[in-house]
């Protein structure tokens, strides 16, 4: 029997089916159109991201350029310095030790109501809050005719200048710039033994005299050569500074020595016995110390002065308002060495509980939600003026932990029952003048350069 196979029977039914073939072509066309639309969207997204990036770069460039021009054109000696922020180290440690979940879950737990409402820490917490409150302004200076370089902490809370000596055999001194008296022709021997104590420990050594240089200013000055810094460990070894340049008052000094700025004025090296701090809003890791005059381009609006109420510290009288909580005639210390606003514990705990602020157990972190509308503008009233500090200046998002959570730069510190410290958050909003001759502190709103 003959078997006949027709061509149309052999052909693929999909090809034979014209409607199916048409649908296939239509589908390909649709996919092509979708791909083109996606490519177009990707292009738009790329342009937007690139535009935002370049806008940021240009804005940052012009911001730094404005600041550079101010510093370049100022008539007064201005020294840039780095700021070592302890909260950065805490957050870095949290991330390094994978404690992000612990922070988030601690906040949820204490907010849930299953535990003590508004947990604010206990005596069992292992990290001292005083440590995280410490702030360091690092700036360069030189000693001797051969300009031996040192990195100083500019500290308004102390009044002596010290550097480590080549005769220092402490562990921390092994990594520091060491002062060598034999290398300087302007060195004058004193040799009087001395020790000076700080909250973190005591240093020991002896007095010497040599030429101190800060920027384009220089003067013969009596300082301490430190030979023993063991009590400062482990802070000293783990920090960048070599020594401390005290910017406090003579009566606070060991040896009754005039502060560097006062001595510069006595020797007619500067016009006024004052110094100022400008902390840029856009960069929390740098600042500028100006000696001998006031650079008006660092601030805007009026510059107002508050009379000191103490002969040892830059301390003034203020009525302080944390929302409904008020401390009348509080002592307010303006301090470059404090990273936060501090307040007496009993006062601050009431405020924190009302504001739904929680302390993370065993960590020096006080946190709340970033959208916490209960947080008020802090107010500081003098007899004639009012200074304010909005939440944006005293809180920051914990972006790498939980973007919904913010930490507060307000800490409980008990100097006594009515003393507050106005540290970095306050000085970042307000350009600050420390005036020895007027025995006053001046404030003006800092420009965002």
Swiss-Prot record:
Record keywords: Aspartyl protease, Disulfide bond, Hydrolase, Membrane, Protease, Signal-anchor, Transmembrane, Transmembrane helix, Vacuole, Zymogen
Domain of life (superkingdom): Eukaryota
Disulfide bond positions: 168-173, 370-406
Propeptide position ranges: 1-121
Cellular localisation: Membrane; Vacuole lumen
Regulation of its function: Inhibited by KNI derived compounds KNI-10333 and to a lesser extent KNI-10743.
Function: During the asexual blood stage, catalyzes the cleavage of denatured host hemoglobin (Hb). Digestion of host Hb is an essential step which provides the parasite with amino acids for protein synthesis, and regulates osmolarity.
Record text on subunit structure and interactions: Component of the hemozoin formation complex (HFC) composed of falcipains FP2A and/or FP2B, plasmepsins PMII, PMIII/HAP and PMIV, heme detoxifying protein HDP and falcilysin FLN. The HFC complex is involved in hemoglobin degradation and detoxification of heme in the food vacuole during the asexual blood stage.
Family under the similarity heading: Belongs to the peptidase A1 family.
Name assigned to this protein: Plasmepsin IV
The organism of origin for this protein: Plasmodium falciparum (isolate 3D7)
Lineage: Eukaryota, Sar, Alveolata, Apicomplexa, Aconoidasida
